[in-house]
Structure formats: structure tokens, C-alpha cells
Amino acid sequence: MDYKGLAILLAVIGSAALAFGAQYQNDAVGDQQGKTTKTAGSLSLKQVLGLLRRPKWLAGTGMIVVALVFQITALSLAPLIVVQPVGAIALVITSLLNARVSKTKLNRLTMLAIGLCVVGIGSFVAVASTIAHEIILTDDLLWDVLAIMAVILVVFGILLFKQGSQLKAIYFITGAGVIYGFVATLTKVIIQRILQGHFEWLTVLCAAMLIVGVALGGWFVQNAYASGPPDLVIAGLTVIDPMVAVLIAATILGEAQQANPLTILGFLAFAATAVTGVLLLSQFHPQILLQKRRAALWAKRKRL
């Protein structure tokens, strides 16, 4: 029986929970940071740990956990390349919610950027749902995923701890998106191996890598909240995350073996559309423009 429709519905519900969770966490990070301007990479370890004492941040975390439950359930019912991109719906919800909360009027370029993200990812899902299929996961395939993820975690871990205070929002968002793309893949892998009756030490290793990925990705996300609006953060996660997950699913896990050259071109075009939306959002969102003006004014005052 085909459960793709149900899986997409569950992913949509999870996206709504993710949007509200992101807004709550973003507000809590702003309160914790005590900032008048947003500076990239400005969260210290003490500030991150301080979030654990903030009810608003905990409420946001709870909503994100609910979103993950729906996402994991959806992943158990349909291929990764169908489920993961549906999260782009969270971008629309987050943008409207943040505009209302922050009393920010979205400009035309921001609306265009959101539209590009949603159309790009929506088209991606439509194509993926027609050619995606489950495969039997071998140990060799799993080792490939783990090896690549280990390199990714080391690279981004070094980048965060060496250059964190100098990074802009788009870099934190990209890092979080790439890491969570692997986290989504490992989640799907663990579900598959349990269903296939292969729960052994390699599966436990996957779970350990998943936990490390969630922790490091979470650090990137909190710093992204400290340096950009929540809809930009969600845009990065709901575009970069699924793109990475789908790339892994298609090239390593073989979920897109039925794709012909025309389909692949479509994937690339839709991916480019969505990524363009994220880049536009990172440059022209009203809150980003306001941050740039404040930063320029602050720099001017320091020179006087």
C-alpha cells in the first residue's frame, strides 16, 4: 500500500510545529542575548546554556520535538526525497508569524524570495514523489554515509570554534542545513534498519553520529537566530537540509534510480530556484537590512 500521501500530510503538520518552535526559540535567543543589534556568532557557551532556563526557548524546543515526531513518522512511511522537502511550508508560516510578532512589513524582494523557495521545493517534491522508491540498505552504503558525515562534522566543528565570532547568518544557516541533511538521512537509515531487523552495533554507531549531528547543528541554529530573523533560518533549513538529504538519497542510497536525464535537469533547476530564494532572503529581508544599517551606524560612532 502506498502511504506517500499520508507521509506528506504528516510532514506538513510537522512543518507547522517547526515554524512556531523556531519563532519561540528566536525570541528567546534575542532576550538571552540582550542585544540592540544582531552580531553574527555572538552567542557564548554561557548564553547558550542560559537558554535552558528560559520557558519560551523550552516551549519552542518542545514544539520542535513534536515536529520531529511527525517527521520521523513520515519518514517511516515514504522515501526521504518525498518527505524531507515538504518542510518548506514552515518557511511561509514562519515568515507570516515573524512579520506579525516583530511588526515587520515584508518587502517585495522578501516575498519573491519566499515564493522562489516554496515553488522550488514544491516542484522538487512533485517530481520526487513520482520516481522515488525504497531500497534495501547495505552496510557498505551506510559506511559511505557515515564517512562523509564524519568529515562534515569535523570541518564545520572546526569552522565554528575557530571562526564563529566572525561568521554571518548565512554561514550558520548553511552549516546547520548541511548537518541536518545528514541527520535526516541517518534518521531514515535507522528506521529502515530497525524495520529490516538489522539493529546492531553499526545502527548504534548511526544513532551516536545522529546525536552529535543534532548537537552541533543545534549550536549553528542558535547562532543563526542570534544573527538573523527566524524566517531566514527556516529558509536555510528547509532548502539546504532537504537538498543535502536528497543528494545523499539519490547518489548514495539509490532512491532515485528511476530518474531519467530530463528528471535530473528538473531537480537541478528546482534546486537552483530554491537556493536563489534563500540567497535573496539573506540579503534583502527587512530585518537584515535594518541590522546592516545599525551595524554601519555603530561602526561610524566607534570611529568618532
Regions from the language model: what does each represent?
Residues 1-304:
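Polytopic alpha-helical membrane proteins, predominantly small-molecule transporters/carriers
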